[in-house]
């Protein structure tokens, strides 16, 4: 059984590919059930964010696990192969440690990914998809992330994607305080972005969400109001800034809707930031005059601020991670011996029961207990000594020398020459 991590991220694949492989939160239970049922994995956890889709699993066949991913999304291997990475054993652990520590993020050192990883593990746990191997991996992953953040400055001076959204808007408009801002969706990402915009005291904050009640709860945090997604077409023209991040599998803001809004605005500019994967806004919207449409990949340059200082801290973090990977590798090797230990104990127990059964029969016949115990001890001694004695009597050359050294070390013997 292999520990395997595979998937793609913002380093290896453009948004147009990443959105094809996304797992909305509501699909995770079904996806995990399907993966385990396919027997391509015994344990599994799926991490799906705007920047990455990764599967961590215990798999008897890495190729089968990858085939499942392609089949689940209706994609061909050839279509995905150029963008995928596959990591096994210690390399899979190293990757998990780096991801949780923010070293593999678009924003070096950002903390949001750690929460997303924990959410993925909780989803896998609720689906009954976690076992000893992945539990061991993720317990260590979260411990490493905590150690990195407490021991280094890797997260210092970072510009989050949420803060970058405000900076982008300020490049287009002179002041956020004069703007009407619309947030589409009511999840964690929208809440983070809304917090940064609210700090600039915009003229109006509105949250559009599929369920009005959830939208209202979020809007109230920022003194705003809420509308339903059905109200978007008639309301869109009111807003100067539109930030979207929903779990919709299809775009919810189309070119026609935005064209009508821009016309109603008399061609005043509109800033749109689509943080969803798959995208919430049709790609063609970006071709419209007076519309400034950005995706998660477009804000990469802004989040580079302060990266040099964090890069130095990242080198310290890599040293910590390397040490913890070595410890995890030792744990993996010990796990591999568990079946052998179990088989060894089973064999010893069979020998014990066989000898005991014979001794009890002798006692039942009236044999002297002393003789029965003596025979029992001799029988067990011979049984235990037969395998090493046979090994010492067989083989030749280097093989024999290795067996001699192994048995001497195993039994802690130091025979005189």
From Swiss-Prot:
One Pfam match: Shikimate_DH
This protein's record includes keyword Oxidoreductase: yes
Signal peptide: none
GO function term, MF aspect, one: NADP binding
Pathway: Porphyrin-containing compound metabolism; protoporphyrin-IX biosynthesis; 5-aminolevulinate from L-glutamyl-tRNA(Glu): step 1/2
InterPro entries in alphabetical order: 4pyrrol_synth_GluRdtase, 4pyrrol_synth_GluRdtase_dimer, 4pyrrol_synth_GluRdtase_N, GluRdtase_CS, GluRdtase_dimer_dom_sf, GluRdtase_N_sf, NAD(P)-bd_dom_sf, Shikm_DH/Glu-tRNA_Rdtase
Catalytic reactions of this protein: (S)-4-amino-5-oxopentanoate + tRNA(Glu) + NADP(+) = L-glutamyl-tRNA(Glu) + NADPH + H(+)
Ligand binding (NADP(+)): 185-190
Active site, per annotation: 50
Taxonomy, superkingdom: Bacteria
Entry EC number(s): 1.2.1.70
This protein's UniProt keywords: NADP, Oxidoreductase, Porphyrin biosynthesis
Domain statement: Possesses an unusual extended V-shaped dimeric structure with each monomer consisting of three distinct domains arranged along a curved 'spinal' alpha-helix. The N-terminal catalytic domain specifically recognizes the glutamate moiety of the substrate. The second domain is the NADPH-binding domain, and the third C-terminal domain is responsible for dimerization.
Protein role: Catalyzes the NADPH-dependent reduction of glutamyl-tRNA(Glu) to glutamate 1-semialdehyde (GSA).
Subunit-structure text: Homodimer.
Further comment: During catalysis, the active site Cys acts as a nucleophile attacking the alpha-carbonyl group of tRNA-bound glutamate with the formation of a thioester intermediate between enzyme and glutamate, and the concomitant release of tRNA(Glu). The thioester intermediate is finally reduced by direct hydride transfer from NADPH, to form the product GSA.
PANTHER family named among the record's database cross-references: GLUTAMYL-TRNA REDUCTASE
HAMAP family: Glu_tRNA_reductase
Designated name of the protein: Glutamyl-tRNA reductase
Organism, scientific name: Chromobacterium violaceum (strain ATCC 12472 / DSM 30191 / JCM 1249 / CCUG 213 / NBRC 12614 / NCIMB 9131 / NCTC 9757 / MK)
Taxonomic lineage of the native organism: Bacteria, Pseudomonadati, Pseudomonadota, Betaproteobacteria, Neisseriales
């Amino acid at each position: 059984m292999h520990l395997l991590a595979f998937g793609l991220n913002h380093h290896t694949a453009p948004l147009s590919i990443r959105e094809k492989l996304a797992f909305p939160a509501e699909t995770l239970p079904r996806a995990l059930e399907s993966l385990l049922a396919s027997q391509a994995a015994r344990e599994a956890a799926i991490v799906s964010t705007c920047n990455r889709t990764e599967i961590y699993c215990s798999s008897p066949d890495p190729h089968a696990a990858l085939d499942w991913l392609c089949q689940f999304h209706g994609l061909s291997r050839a279509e995905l192969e150029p963008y995928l990475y596959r990591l096994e054993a210690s390399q899979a652990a190293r990757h998990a440690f780096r991801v949780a520590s923010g070293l593999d993020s678009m924003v070096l050192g950002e903390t949001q990914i750690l929460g997303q990883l924990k959410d993925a593990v909780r989803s896998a746990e609720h689906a009954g998809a976690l076992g000893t191997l992945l539990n061991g991996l993720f317990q260590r992953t979260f411990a490493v992330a905590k150690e990195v953040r407490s021991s280094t400055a890797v997260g210092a001076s970072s510009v989050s994607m949420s803060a970058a959204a405000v900076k982008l808007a300020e490049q287009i408009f002179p002041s956020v305080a004069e703007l009407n801002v619309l947030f589409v969706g009511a999840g964690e990402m929208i809440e983070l972005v809304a917090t940064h915009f609210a700090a600039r005291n915009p003229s109006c904050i509105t949250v559009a969400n599929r369920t009005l009640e959830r939208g209202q709860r979020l809007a109230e945090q920022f003194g705003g109001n809420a509308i339903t997604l059905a109200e978007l077409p008639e309301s869109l023209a009111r807003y100067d800034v539109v930030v979207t991040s929903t779990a919709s599998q299809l775009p919810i803001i189309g070119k026609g809707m935005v064209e009508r809004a821009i016309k109603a605005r008399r061609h005043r500019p509109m800033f749109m930031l689509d943080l969803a994967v798959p995208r919430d806004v049709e790609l063609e919207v970006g071709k419209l005059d007076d519309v400034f449409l950005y995706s998660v990949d477009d804000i990469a340059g802004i989040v580079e601020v302060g990266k040099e200082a964090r890069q130095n801290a990242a080198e310290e973090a890599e040293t910590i991670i390397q040490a913890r990977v070595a410890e995890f590798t030792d744990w993996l090797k010990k796990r591999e011996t568990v079946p052998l230990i179990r088989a060894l104990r089973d064999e010893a127990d069979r020998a014990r029961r066989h000898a005991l059964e014979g001794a009890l029969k002798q006692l039942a016949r009236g044999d002297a207990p002393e003789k029965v115990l003596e025979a029992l001890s001799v029988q067990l001694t011979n049984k235990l000594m037969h395998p090493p004695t046979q090994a010492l009597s067989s083989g030749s050359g280097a093989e024999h020398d290795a067996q001699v050294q192994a048995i001497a070390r195993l039994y802690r013997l130091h025979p005189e020459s």
